[in-house]
């Protein structure tokens, strides 16, 4: 058995030279060396492949991130001074995750938490909750915005669905033909990209969808799935792109993400990513409610207000929940009893987390895993004010 204690989560950082940035490394205090010269698109704060550090302070120079890519992020690794989360769970799933979690999801980590900085991504959706399909699995997800951003959310009211499908289908056919020409050497990459840009203007897939502009502190809940969404980019108005904290059910993209428009992206060799346009239109929720962006912006619920801290529930779905705690005043405390695991992310400030007989220091941008067997944990504020996100 392992000690009853909190664990620093070793973040897995995904380098994304085309759509990442330096926000994540700066927040974590790691904007130096390799991380100062590479753009980071995502930090996996919790996943089934997470490793838990035995180090007791995120400010310890030996506490380092894992640098990886989106294809390898779930593969087993063995950083120094750590234990794999999966190994901890295997010792006693109920004691680590909680009885209700194991009953609902089985003896595995069901939650995927990502700290993201991203420019535009594809038009996409996930099959509706409860769908049984030989390939596709639902992927409930929710976004909590740290900075103002730009998205598409739902399809416009009164849209001609056949025209929308025809538009993205023909556009994809032309782009695939250009891809073959580049791959065969009969057309240059530059010429193909120039033609793609003209085709996007002609077919204009964005004319069919709603734009929305989340502010810092907004939460968008897409957990019912079947909802069109994408991140968009305007580097003049939103130079940081979309900076957000994502909660998802731990399902990988290759069995969950159905795309209809990939923004005309073409790799250096001329290849393009396959789209799933027929499935996109087969599984999209066409109801007015699902396609109204206002449906998905969630209002928080006030829980507690005390002199030393305040607590609000940002959201609660049948898969996961997210609370925000603001601790005010140096050495102010927060205490909680638990019947399931908790994940604590420090959005700002610095805290000391104690569970069992172990205390760890957690600075801004870092996170802690607290197993259910701790039964309770306490937080002492090490700064003037700290903002904490608690997921479970």
Question: Which residues does each PLM region occupy?
Answer:
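His/acidic/aromatic-lined binding-pocket segments of jelly-roll/cupin-type domains
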Residues: 112-114, 121, 134-136, 141-144, ...
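Loop-centered beta-sheet repeat module
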Residues: 193-257
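Short, basic/aromatic beta-hairpin or loop at an interaction surface
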Residues: 186-202, 338-347
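Short beta-strand segments in beta-sandwich/barrel cores
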Residues: 151, 332-333, 342, 349-354
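Short acidic-glycine-tyrosine-enriched beta hairpin
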Residues: 209-221, 356-374
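Ligand-binding loop in jelly-roll beta-barrel domains
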Residues: 116-120, 128, 137-138, 147-150, ...
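Functionally critical, mid-to-C-terminal surface segments that flank or help form catalytic/ligand
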Residues: 277-339
């Amino acid at each position: 058995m392992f000690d009853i204690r909190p664990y620093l989560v070793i973040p897995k950082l995904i380098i994304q030279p085309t759509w990442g940035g330096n926000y994540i490394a700066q927040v974590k205090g790691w904007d130096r060396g390799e991380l100062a010269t590479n753009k980071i698109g995502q930090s996996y704060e919790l996943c089934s492949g997470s490793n838990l550090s035995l180090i007791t302070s995120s400010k310890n120079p030996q506490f380092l991130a894992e640098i990886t890519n989106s294809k390898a992020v779930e593969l087993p690794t063995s950083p120094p001074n750590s234990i794999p989360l999966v190994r901890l769970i295997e010792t006693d799933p109920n004691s680590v995750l909680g009885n209700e979690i194991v009953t609902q999801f089985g003896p595995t980590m069901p939650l995927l938490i990502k700290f993201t900085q991203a420019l535009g991504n594809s038009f996409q959706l996930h099959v509706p909750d409860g769908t049984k399909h030989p390939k596709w699995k639902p992927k409930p997800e929710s976004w909590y915005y740290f900075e103002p951003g730009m998205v598409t959310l739902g399809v416009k009211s009164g849209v001609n669905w056949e025209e929308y499908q025809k538009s993205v289908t023909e556009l994809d056919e032309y782009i695939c033909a250009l891809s073959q020409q580049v791959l065969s050497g009969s057309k240059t990459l530059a010429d193909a990209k120039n033609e793609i840009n003209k085709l996007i203007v002609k077919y204009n897939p964005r004319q069919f969808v709603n734009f929305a502009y989340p502010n810092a502190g907004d939460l968008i809940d897409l957990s019912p799935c079947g909802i069109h969404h994408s991140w968009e980019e305007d580097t003049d108005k939103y130079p940081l792109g979309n900076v957000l904290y994502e909660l998802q059910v731990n399902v990988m993209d290759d069995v969950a993400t159905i795309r209809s428009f990939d923004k005309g992206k073409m790799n250096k060799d001329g290849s393009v990513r396959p789209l799933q346009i027929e499935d996109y239109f087969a599984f999209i929720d066409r109801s007015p409610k699902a396609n109204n962006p206002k449906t998905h912006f969630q209002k928080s619920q006030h829980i507690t207000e005390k002199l030393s801290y305040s607590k609000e529930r940002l959201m609660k779905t049948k898969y996961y929940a997210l609370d925000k705690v603001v601790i005010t005043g140096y050495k102010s405390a927060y205490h909680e009893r638990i019947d399931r695991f908790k994940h604590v992310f420090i959005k700002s400030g610095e805290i000391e987390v104690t569970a069992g007989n172990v205390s760890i220091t957690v600075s801004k941008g870092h996170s802690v895993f607290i197993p259910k067997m701790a039964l309770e944990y306490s937080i002492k504020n090490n700064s003037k004010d700290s903002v904490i996100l608690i997921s479970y």
